[in-house]
Structure formats: C-alpha cells, structure tokens
Amino acid sequence: MAIRKKSNKNPPVLSHEFVLQNHADIVSCLAMLFLLGLMFEITAKGAIIFVALQYNVTRPATEEQAAESASLYYYGIKDLATVFFYMLVAIIVHAIIQEYVLDKINRRMHFSKTKHSKFNESGQLSAFYLFACVWGTFILVSENYISDPTILWRAYPHNLMTFQMKFFYISQLAYWLHAFPELYFQKTKKEDIPRQLVYIGLYLFHIAGAYLLNLNHLGLVLLVLHYFVEFLFHISRLFYFSDEKYQKGFSLWAVLFVLGRLLTLILSVLTVGFGLARAENQKLDFSTGNFNVLAVRIAVLASICITQAFMMWKFINFQLRRWREHSAFQAPPVKRKPAVTKGRSSRKGTENGVNGTVTSNGADSPRSRKEKSS
C-alpha cells in the first residue's frame, strides 16, 4: 500500500487552515476529555455537570401513578455547562453529516460555489429540522398535549419538566449556539454573515425566552410547527438543486408557511392573552418561576407578533422576487426594429431611386439646385 505524501499540503499546526481542516477532530478530543473525567472519582463531580442534566427532583407517586415516582427537572446556572458540552456534540455531528453525506453528493453533482454553499446549508438544516420535529412530536404525544390543549396554560408556572422536555431545550440551545463557530469553520461569505446572525439570534432569543419564562409547553408546540414548515422548504430546495424544474414543494411550502404564521399567532394569543390572563396567580415570583404579570405577557406577545411580521415581510419579498424571475424567464424575446440611418446618402437613395437604384429622372438635391441657381 503506497503512502500518500501530505507533507507539502499539510498546513502548520494551530494555523488558520489547520484549525479549519481539523476542527472536528479537535472538538472530538475536547469532548472526550469530559467523558474520560467521568471515569475517575476526583474529576467525576465536575465532568458530570457537563454531560448529565442537572437540577432534578423526585416527585412521589400519587394514587393515580402508584407504581412509579417521576423524576422532574428545573433550570439553573449549571445548565450552561451542559449546553456547552452538547454544543461540542453538535459540531461533531455537523462535521460527520458534511463529510460523509453532503460532500459526497457535491462531488457527484458538480455544483457551483453559490449552489454549493446553499446546498450545504439546506442539507444541514433539513437533517436538524427533521430530527427535532420528530422528537418534539414524540414529546407532544407522550405528554398528551394534542388531546388536551389546555395544558399549554393550565397549572402555570411549568417550572418542572420531564427529562425529555429539558433535554429537548438543552439540545436546541446547544445546536443554535454551535451555529456561531460554524460560520468560521465553513468559511461563510461576509455578505451572508449578517443574514445568518439574524436568524440564529432569533432562534436563541425565542427558545431561551420560552425556557427561562417557564413557557416550555407553548414553546415546544410552536417549535414543532415552525420546524415542520422549515423542513419542507429546505428539502424542496435540495430537490430544486438536483432538478431546477421542481417547483411543487415550494408551492406547498408557501401555503403552509402562511398557515403556520396564523397558527402561531392564534396559539400565542390563546395561551398568553386569554389562558394566562385568566389565571388566579398573577404575581411576579422568581422563587417559583411565576412570570404571569401583564408586562411580561405584553412583551411575549409583542416579540412573537414582531417576529411573525418580519418573517411574512421576508416571505413576501421572496415570493415577489421568484415571480419576477419566472415572468422574465417566460416572457418572449422582443424583436428589435432595424435602425434607420438619417444620412444624406440614405435620403437620396429613397427619394431618387427604386430599391436603392438611382434613376435619371429623379429630382435634383437641394445642393445641386443651389449650384444651378448660382
């Protein structure tokens, strides 16, 4: 087996190119340090803060659930360490999908640089949206959210979460935080960075807001709804890159996008504007996690409405741009009329000749008449 010579291509250790090429291996080694810390008694107490969920309490069994006691969780400052560890996991998974799936497809399809970056973006996001949507739907079904919608606001504050619920939110925060270093690892263009920062910031703002304000029930429903619509868009864009005639997915996405925005507003107003507004306990209490006061409710509804309006504005601009491009592509080419020269020779040919041939009986030109008169 021949040994490949890489000495001329390998960048210097810890250089810019070295970090970009080997960032997945570097992050994997860092994550392994936390896992190895669990094996030793001295470091286990510190390592477990990063790996396992914190702040669990055991609720005693009731008469309805006499067979088992439930372990519930609340949030705290140690969750930042857990989010950091799973952010490293998200970077590793991102690199695996990129190297073993997307890069192989890119080599076969021979995309341009613009399509290459958009294909990678849609490939990564479609995989994440599908996974998160299936996971979130499983939580909704297992905790009877669909059969009893009043659980969205009943018994607020929802400061105690099941393992699946808390792990879902930790994973969401970790994934969207990992998107910041990925802008550097993936060599994102400078003109694309502001757009990326806007939607990453919006995700983190709303997910963290639902998590910290104990609106995790409402946040889960809205995330599943939003992720399903976004998954349809990115999977349609993947099919479009392979066949530019494919437009059915975008048409279905356009309808579901508008319906998704309406459902988001309806559920938000129903939960925050009516459900929580009629609750008996409307006092601000940080110890119990009760934020059901008028100012917080107005802020929550305002942030949701502004975000939905911003998304609709972007959606309308996107549809208008696609409509203009489609109209320009379908419009027939305009036939240009031949330019008519206004020189003296052309006028002489039209006035004194037939089919461009000068006749002997033609009238004299103004200059010749002037010379004769003189």
Swiss-Prot record:
Entry keyword set: Endoplasmic reticulum, Glycoprotein, Membrane, Phosphoprotein, Protein transport, Translocation, Transmembrane, Transmembrane helix, Transport
Major localization listed first in the record, in broad terms: endoplasmic reticulum
Spans annotated as Disordered: 333-374
Lumenal side: 54-81, 143-159, 214, 273-297
GO CC terms: endoplasmic reticulum; endoplasmic reticulum membrane
Annotated localization: Endoplasmic reticulum membrane
Stated role: Involved in the translocation of nascent protein chains into or through the endoplasmic reticulum (ER) membrane by facilitating the proper chain positioning at the SEC61 channel. Regulates the exposure of nascent secretory protein chain to the cytosol during translocation into the ER. May affect the phospholipid bilayer in the vicinity of the lateral gate of the SEC61 channel, thereby facilitating ER protein transport. Intimately associates with transmembrane (TM) domain of nascent membrane proteins during the entire integration process into the ER membrane.
Protein name: Translocating chain-associated membrane protein 1
Species in which this protein is naturally found: Rattus norvegicus (Rat)
